[in-house]
Amino acid sequence: QLPNVVSREEELALKAIQTTYQVDDRYNAVTHSFLQSCVEIFRDAPVTLLREHYRCHPKIIEFCNQRFYNGELIAMTTDDGEKDVLQVIRTVPGNHARGHFNKREIDVITQEVLPECAESESIGIITPYRAQAEAINQAVGKDIASTVHKYQGRECDTIIMSMVDNYPTEFSDDANLLNVAISRA
């Protein structure tokens, strides 16, 4: 579960409340998801990892399993010999991002990636940033892109991930965000 996305203004307001009323940091909605707060507050409560995974192709969940779960997950899906279940497509070198928007990535998605996925039953595009999702939806003429946070709990046969940033940032390089993003397919 990902923590909330809050504006700088909301963060400052929450910080003021936390300071004024001496609220324990475990309740910090900026840095903690509800689940994280519960785990920290109820330290003696039993925690259960749901190990059986039914969503992703085994090759995709194996990446997440090794990177984020210390090999504890059990893939319950089958590998039917599909090729290229996890691909990385890089745009041309250069500084194409402008804030939370990357036109070059949108061009590559619409002109190169989506035509390759035409036979897929369901396609979703995820990105860390709302501005990028809105621009992608406008470019493709339908509502198929959303933020990683809003995609939690959803899945598609094909997921395209638009990272936007030219270089990793504290936000886009977050391990929880990457885990949720990768495991949507």
Regions found by a protein language model. Give the residues of each.
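Conserved helicase motor core of SF1/SF2 NTP-dependent helicases
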Residues: 1-185
